[in-house]
Amino acid sequence: YWYGFNPRQKDFLAEADSGFLVMACVDLQFAFAVPYEVLEPIIPYLNVTENDEGITHWHLQINPPENGEYQFVIPKKGEKLSLKKYEIQLPQIQPVKIAV
């Protein structure tokens, strides 16, 4: 899974007393709610896309389960962060039947 995290989003979360970046995955019944205090120190170690004005976004990559746990990739440190404790269950939604 891949997400783009832009400077405006970073600034918004930084201003919150308790900010969370929530990342959902279309095919999973849970999402990841990562506290900004966990995310902030690893931002300098993420890959970026830049233009003449600076960073347009940081690349957030989640790898498929390793030992049953999804992992957040921190490429410039060669590390991974387990996302297990940041999983939040999503409600199961039943498909809606539409009369034609």
Per-range role (PLM):
Residues Y1-A31:
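Catalytic cores of nucleic-acid endonucleases
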Residues L28, F32-V100:
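Non-catalytic C-terminal interaction segments of nucleic acid-processing enzymes
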